UniProtKB/Swiss-Prot annotation:
Compartments reported by the entry: Cytoplasm
Species this chain originates from: Pectobacterium atrosepticum (strain SCRI 1043 / ATCC BAA-672) (Erwinia carotovora subsp. atroseptica)
Enzyme Commission no: 2.3.1.16
The protein's name: 3-ketoacyl-CoA thiolase
CDD domains assigned to the protein according to its UniProt record, in alphabetical order: thiolase
Gene name of this polypeptide: fadA
Known partners and oligomeric status: Heterotetramer of two alpha chains (FadB) and two beta chains (FadA).
Cellular component annotations (GO), alphabetically ordered: cytoplasm
Stored NCBIfam families: AcCoA-C-Actrans (TIGR01930), fadA (TIGR02445), PRK08947.1 (NF006510)
Superkingdom of the source species: Bacteria
Annotated HAMAP family: FadA
Catalysed reactions listed for this entry: an acyl-CoA + acetyl-CoA = a 3-oxoacyl-CoA + CoA
Reported function: Catalyzes the final step of fatty acid oxidation in which acetyl-CoA is released and the CoA ester of a fatty acid two carbons shorter is formed.
Active site: C91, H343, C373
Lineage, uppermost ranks: Bacteria, Pseudomonadati, Pseudomonadota, Gammaproteobacteria, Enterobacterales
Similarity field: Belongs to the thiolase-like superfamily. Thiolase family.
Length: 387
């Protein structure tokens, strides 16, 4: 079976969904911009050699409808002979895009793929057109469709206090701000055109969503967002609403060698699991364990972890049950996470994988894991190995 390698990985800055930098930029343009960027950064690859494009997106309606992957590829002027498909596994969509492309390469159905994802939550809100089947109430709790309440459930089950959540949320903003100031994100962000507060067109090269003035005290003043009477989850300890895209160039190891392209990482193992929809945020735990089993590795072998921070109340139980609380500041979300950067649904899987690979390089880590929870009770994980 062919080994799958990551040749390059990029993302746009994360724009604030409400009146933010990308308020006049469409999802297809964010995606096409990254497709063009990957090709311009890797000139040894002829675009005609791309076998397929896999692009994650959750709300496939309006500008994100009618196969946004193909629309973006056409905008990017990728040859019409290159096919493209849009992938939806809710929050794990662009990581699923990576898995689908990797499997195609492993079995010889492809040699070169572009993968990525996009979500413009300002233009296409996550509740746009949602219409759950009423019969689901017979098989799952009604709250399973309300992500904030699933986080509240996990907090109660795992004794995660409001104070712990606020502390973790403040950490996310502080670390993301430090990563911005130190230039750590420069290796992954492709400057992207947007509009400033006055409507002037400019190129953004920083994440707009980070709040550097966030403190535990300022978070403590916020009211519960989902359970007003007994809740502990607030807007401040939840992932921000943001717009963005992410992308990777992946190929077989043999094709990368023949093109003379540097290899940044290999895919060691992949996994997707299901779990109780009422505690959907717990999915990273069984997904990570299964991926590590397939990789023949243990938790102790992993140098860096990236967990998507849907909620602090969701992330902390996962960190706790993976035995990582004592190593939090050495191994987990070292540049912050979705609480600070936002969680543009279809973008996030490739985004956290991109951040992970950059951290593995800067920290000289051999192995890393990127993992996410998924609405309605799933988890997804990928084990990466430095080349």
């Amino acid at each position: 079976m062919e080994k799958v390698v990551i040749v390059d990985a990029v993302r746009t800055p994360m724009g604030r969904s409400k009146g933010g930098a990308f308020r006049q930029v469409r999802a297809e343009d964010l995606s096409a911009h990254l497709m063009r960027s990957l090709l311009s950064r890797n000139t040894a690859l002829d675009a005609r050699e791309i076998d397929d494009i896999y692009w994650g997106c959750v709300q496939q309606a309006l500008e994100q409808g009618f196969n946004v992957a193909r629309n973006a590829a056409l905008l990017a002027e990728i040859p019409v002979s290159v096919p493209a498909t849009t992938v939806n596994r809710l929050c794990g969509s662009s990581m699923q895009a990576l898995h689908d492309a990797a499997r195609a390469i492993m079995v010889g159905d492809a040699n070169v793929c572009l993968i990525g994802g996009v979500e413009h939550m300002g233009h296409v809100p996550m509740n746009h057109g949602v219409d759950f089947h009423p019969g689901l109430s017979r098989t799952i709790a009604k709250a399973a469709g309300m992500m904030g309440l699933t986080a509240e459930m996990l907090a109660r089950m795992h004794n995660i206090s409001r104070e712990m959540q606020d502390q973790f949320a403040a950490r996310s903003h502080q670390r993301a701000y430090h990563a911005t100031q130190s230039g750590a994100f420069r290796h992954e962000i492709v400057p992207t055109a947007g509009h400033d507060a006055d409507g002037a067109l400019q190129r953004f090269d920083y994440d707009e969503v980070i709040r550097p003035d966030t403190t535990i005290d300022s978070l403590a003043a916020l009211k519960p967002a989902f359970d007003p009477v007994n809740g502990t989850v607030t807007a401040g300890s939840s992932s921000a609403l943001s717009d963005g895209a992410s992308a990777m160039l992946i190929m077989s190891e043999s094709r990368a060698a023949s093109l003379g392209l540097p290899v940044r990482a290999r895919i060691r193992a992949m996994a997707v699991v299901g779990c109780d929809p009422s505690i959907m945020g717990y999915g990273p735990v069984p997904a990570t364990k299964l991926a590590l089993k397939r990789a023949g590795l243990s938790l102790a072998d992993i140098g860096i972890f990236e967990l998507n921070e849907a909620f602090a109340a969701q992330t902390l139980p996962c960190i706790k049950d993976l035995g990582l609380l004592e190593q939090l500041d050495e191994k987990v979300n070292l540049n912050g996470g979705a609480i600070a950067l936002g969680h543009p649904l279809g973008c996030s899987g490739a985004r956290i994988s991109t951040t992970l690979i950059n951290l593995m390089e800067s920290r000289d880590a051999q192995f890393g894991v990127a993992t996410m929870c998924i609405g309605l009770g799933q988890g997804i994980a990928t084990v990466f190995e430095r080349a």
